[in-house]
């Protein structure tokens, strides 16, 4: 393992992949607890780069309830990235002991330039703060780089930004489904985070879509999107992110691992008008290059 990894500290790790068959997933948890003692279960709400629906808070509640029935002292820790403010609850009200996320995603409202948050049981939050600063100091000291006002303003804007992003994700799903591609989630269905997955089945088309979205960006629209390696990933990535905040995924952006079956993951958007413009531009370019036909442009119900 890398320096400072869990393995270096002799902390064992076991992964259970989430699949659409939720019952079999629960069976894997029970089986794992029978074979191993467990201090903490890390639950990833979003789909990441896998082809599955992101977890709902109701599903997270079932997982946490099951884990606590197997071991009441086990900590349920939820990576809540992309999920904040999407549903009418958050995982900490559904049995999670602690959650964490990024401020260049949902809660930052597209204006917070860096940072993250933790929330949940006070003792666990203080433990995280002690790890961030130093033992004995914890949350009583630290630095926010003078971003207090931006963080509060971003939090104030976040519900509206999430609303626009959700409308945009549904429109992306509808457009690509009308073009004949598999999409997840389907348009006009329940969503538990901001991510819209599209299966393009073609590396050249992935590059074309990412480049078109980059060209419609408010920042760096002139840049070429090229595949590149990134630490922590096992394949090259394409990223379209002409965003005001570098790396922001609460702003309209897309990324894709360059591996079969060539899925692209679209998220964010500060207002639906920008997402419409990006989709219109993409469709115009695909028509011009005869990659789609006018017959495939069905009226949208969105």
What positions do the PLM features span?
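Conserved C-terminal alpha-helix-loop-beta "cap" of PLP-dependent enzymes
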Residues: 177-300
